[in-house]
Amino acid sequence: MFQTESHPAGGSPLQSIRSSCDRCRLQKLKCTVQSMESDGRMVCERCVRAKVPCAFGRRRRASRPSDTKKQGDSSTRRSTAPRTTNPEPTVLTPPLSTTSSTSEQTLGGATPSPTLATSSALEAPLETLAECEPDTTAPTYSYHHHHHDSYQLGEGPPTPFPNPATTGGGSGSSMMDWDWLEQDFHANELYCLDPELLASAPASTSTSTGSPTAHHRALPDGGSGSSTMSMGGGADTPFSTTASVAGRRLPALIAEMQQRLEALENGAWLHDGAQSFDHYPIGAVLRLSQEFGALAGQVLGMAATYGGGGGVPPSDVAGLQMMAAVGGGGGLYELGRGGLAEGGSSTATVLLVLGGYVFLVRLYGLVLGHFHAHLNRIPSGSLGGHMHSTPAPTTSPTLQLGELPSGGAMPDVSRIHAALGMLLAALHSVEEQLGQGGEVAREMVVSILTQGSGLEPAKLQDGFGDLGEKVRSVKELLREKMGL
């Protein structure tokens, strides 16, 4: 397998045969010549055992140039240096020099610019530029760096996401601006827990400076709704500001509902190993219900006031249902302009109200499921047939189930009984604004859908019917555990 390479006699770079075969040299192993074949080829032991061809190559002359050759190369480079073209004035500066020379000619300068000779170098053939060695001098870096900085510091191409620092504010109208959030939405009030307040508070009242919960408060004696809102719909009223705040607050509130729902779903409340429900966050659920009811009442109050022309309060569910059924006939919806009538709540805000109610129903369903599972783990007993527990004097977002008052020999059952009453009272206040099962908001959305797509309201199914079944199931378990 050994083959000698034929080269001219005077310029052959090959020398003597190597002492190790190519295979051993590649694997960096010791090569031991075993025998010499009849044709003159040498074979090593490893190649014989591996039954592979064994080839011994020849050494090559060193490629390192001698001192004489180095001197000759340096003199050759010096002699050919004047014939090379300097790439610095040819490649980098022509764009700038061409601009300057053009401007001077435009201004009518009599003396030609010295950069014209440089700009004429642009006409040099590409072969001349290709012969030049690449140069990485400072002007090359400074030119490109300057060009990059000018692009970065400039206005640049238009972007669909404006920069608040350059647009001069305007972030107040953005839904992602959280500066308008209030830290305290009066969640400590008991307006939704007292039946007398629920019956006496006209939900259509509101002020421009009041909190969202002021939507449920009664007017002062002798006051009327005409002092705080306009029935015409053409003039500026406090409702426009209130609806704007409600429309901006609803997405954040729905996000809080989703976070609370995920936190309760991932908790240990459904496991048999849960020792106690004392730390169950009942106050957070109550706060979400109360705040959502206030915001929903404001949004639907705007729709009723400006859409129907009659100033129907949101608590008048029958009036809102009639207006929603009439639809475009009462001026409530004008789909040609993409929303409700001018001055009323937008279609997107009404959809947010319905979406928030969906999350609230899911949240209540999960809480009732936790109560049901916890009551199943408690042995049945008797509390004497009566419960004398009252709600806590104050309710806060941090209220826990263990902080509720308890009575009798079964404190867990009595606390769940009190918590269920508070939750149902809060849900009742929400349904006073939205109707039973969110019927008012659904009728408004259905009216939009039927006008836009021709759907029949009878074909839309109610997806919240199982919530009443869960309430009845928990009540039956409470009666069973209490021995009633």
From Swiss-Prot:
Annotated stretches, region: Disordered: 59-117, 136-174, 202-242, 386-406
Record-annotated DNA-binding residue ranges: 21-54
Alphabetized InterPro entries for the sequence: Carb_Metab_Trans_Reg, Zn2-C6_fun-type_DNA-bd_sf, Zn2Cys6_DnaBD
Keyword DNA-binding among UniProt keywords: yes
Gene3D superfamilies: Zn(2)-C6 fungal-type DNA-binding domain
A single cellular component GO annotation: nucleus
Single GO molecular function: zinc ion binding
Keyword Cytoplasm: no
Compartments where located: Nucleus
PROSITE patterns on file: ZN2_CY6_FUNGAL_1, ZN2_CY6_FUNGAL_2
Biased composition (Basic and acidic residues): 64-76
Organism superkingdom: Eukaryota
Keywords, alphabetical: DNA-binding, Metal-binding, Nucleus, Transcription, Transcription regulation, Zinc
Biased composition annotated in UniProt, kind: Low complexity: 77-107, 202-213
Protein purpose: Transcription factor that regulates the expression of the gene cluster that mediates the biosynthesis of the tetramic acid Sch210972, a potential anti-HIV fungal natural product that contains a decalin core.
Annotated protein name in UniProt: Transcription factor cghD
Lineage: Eukaryota, Fungi, Dikarya, Ascomycota, Pezizomycotina
Gene (UniProt): cghD
